[in-house]
């Protein structure tokens, strides 16, 4: 929902989902509203959570308080709730109410750092999937040597039939066109090697579907995980099991690399002086975003009849702010759902 008056975008925040409590979502919202994490549109927030937990925190962030409404929800989805339990017993939770308001059109999108399985189950139940799409996929934008690429599925569907992987390719292309601005995105299929004999039966069958598709999906072929970050494809398709491992590994390696660099640079007087220069020029100019995995937080549940963005449960305020920014970015791409339906129908 992008309102004409000042292009204001409405976003629902599940304040109870983050591992570190409601302040993650509220401080993250403050970073967006203050411009510390800039968005292209003005943002108005609906914040969902338990009054006793949220209001004391909200009172500390006057800018958020001024640009939001608070909705008291007596329950919350827990990190160990099974999806089936959440569907039956968490209908008054902050997560449920936020997504339900997306369905009603009260807000344009919902952002949650809560239980992934419950979020997917509740979103599918309340919003449903787009016509022709069997299951949603978790998709995000990751950095590469050539810029960025879209990766999906990152954990929603551990096992995927070949036809589902083909749908992910179509969805990923539409997403890449919308958020990366690539007119004819190149699609790769994640595998353990480039040879025809490599990979599981489902991967090999998905390869054949993508290669022989009626419409040209600009299929690159198999992509190894190390090649994905070289930028050989604009979209990398995977089953949720492999995709999630790839994502978590790259995040861990990025964190380890920064840790080692900082340790080595700061081990000498000259190194510490160089670090101060870096902080005063490069990091001030770029916000260090290229080296900070928090700037890539926020994965879209792609294929739903509505916009839901998943933040890492362990996210801090900066990471959560980037998840809000991702929601705003997707809202502004109004024709993406129609494009997915059209391409899946023609596949």
UniProtKB/Swiss-Prot annotation:
EC number(s) recorded for this UniProt protein: 2.3.1.274
Catalytic activity reported: a fatty acyl-[ACP] + phosphate = an acyl phosphate + holo-[ACP]
Annotated compartments: Cytoplasm
Keyword Lipid metabolism found: yes
Keywords from the named record: Cytoplasm, Lipid biosynthesis, Lipid metabolism, Phospholipid biosynthesis, Phospholipid metabolism, Transferase
GO biological process entries: fatty acid biosynthetic process; phospholipid biosynthetic process
Enzyme class name: transferase
Principal location listed in the UniProt entry: cytoplasm
Gene3D superfamilies xref list: Isopropylmalate Dehydrogenase (3.40.718.10)
GO MF annotation list: phosphate:acyl-[acyl carrier protein] acyltransferase activity
Stated role: Catalyzes the reversible formation of acyl-phosphate (acyl-PO(4)) from acyl-[acyl-carrier-protein] (acyl-ACP). This enzyme utilizes acyl-ACP as fatty acyl donor, but not acyl-CoA.
Similarity section: Belongs to the PlsX family.
PANTHER family: FATTY ACID/PHOSPHOLIPID SYNTHESIS PROTEIN PLSX, PHOSPHATE ACYLTRANSFERASE
HAMAP family: PlsX (MF_00019)
Protein name: Phosphate acyltransferase
Annotated source species: Anaplasma marginale (strain Florida)
Lineage: Bacteria, Pseudomonadati, Pseudomonadota, Alphaproteobacteria, Rickettsiales
């Amino acid at each position: 929902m992008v309102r004409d008056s000042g292009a204001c975008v409405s976003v629902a925040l599940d304040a109870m989902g983050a591992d570190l409590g409601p302040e993650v979502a509220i401080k993250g919202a403050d970073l967006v509203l203050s411009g510390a994490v800039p968005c292209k549109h003005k943002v108005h927030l609906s914040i969902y959570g338990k009054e006793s937990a949220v209001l004391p925190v909200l009172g500390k962030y006057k800018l958020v308080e001024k640009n939001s409404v608070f909705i008291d929800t007596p329950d919350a989805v827990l990190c160990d709730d099974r999806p089936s339990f959440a569907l039956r017993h968490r209908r008054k939770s902050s997560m449920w109410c936020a997504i339900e308001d997306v369905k009603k059109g009260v807000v344009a999108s919902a952002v949650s750092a809560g239980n992934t399985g419950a979020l997917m189950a509740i979103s599918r139940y309340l919003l449903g999937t787009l016509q022709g799409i069997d299951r949603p996929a978790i998709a995000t934008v990751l950095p590469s040597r050539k810029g960025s690429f879209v990766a999906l599925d990152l954990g929603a569907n551990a096992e995927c039939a070949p036809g589902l992987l083909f749908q992910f390719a179509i969805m990923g292309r539409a997403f890449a066109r919308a958020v990366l601005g690539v007119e004819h995105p190149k699609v790769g299929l994640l595998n353990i090697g480039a040879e025809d004999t490599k990979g599981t039966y489902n991967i090999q069958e998905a390869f054949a579907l993508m290669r022989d598709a009626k419409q040209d999906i600009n299929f690159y072929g198999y992509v190894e995980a190390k090649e994905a970050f070289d930028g050989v494809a604009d979209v990398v398709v995977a089953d949720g099991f492999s995709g999630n491992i790839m994502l978590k590994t790259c995040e861990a390696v990025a964190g380890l690399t920064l840790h080692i660099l900082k340790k080595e640079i700061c081990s000498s007087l000259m190194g510490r002086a160089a670090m101060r220069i870096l902080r005063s020029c490069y990091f001030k100019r770029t916000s260090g975003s290229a080296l900070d995995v928090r700037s890539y937080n926020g994965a879209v549940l792609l294929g739903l009849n509505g916009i839901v963005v998943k933040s890492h449960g362990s996210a801090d305020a900066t990471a959560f702010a980037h998840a809000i920014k991702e929601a705003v970015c997707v809202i502004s791409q109004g024709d993406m759902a129609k494009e997915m339906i059209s391409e899946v129908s023609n596949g």
